[in-house]
Amino acid sequence: MLRITATQIDEMIAHVRAEAPNEGCGMLGGTDGSVLAVFPARNAAASPIRFTIHPEDLLHIVRTVEYERDWQILGIFHSHIASPAYPSATDVAEAEFDMGDGELAERYPGAVHVVISLANPAEPDVRGYTIRQREIGAVPLQVVPDTV
């Protein structure tokens, strides 16, 4: 389960809408399964059907999350412009890499893959998944109150 606020979901949706017609992307930082900050990123692929977090943004986010704040990368988010909020074959293929011996390793170990569908722009659909060994598993997103 990933705990996230409605405000953070709205931040992700606003970012991916602003990136349309290309996929939008970013990362989620926090601790103990609770998102503490949303980190929008540029899509280096500049594509409506795939995303790659821009290397400069990735470096900045990882430094901020892991070194400055002592948090973890809890999730990676991206949009699907015209398809459901479910990992595509490309998403699955790019979530892991071959270690050279046929063993697959996650690019972002333990991170939840959050997919935001903009197929119905008035009602974006936001869902979470794990992708491990090319298998997709649903991860509940628990919407929690904003802290003051």
Predicted segments with their positions:
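Conserved beta-strand-loop surface patch within small alpha/beta domains used
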Residues: 1-73, 81-148
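Conserved, mostly hydrophobic/aromatic
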Residues: 76
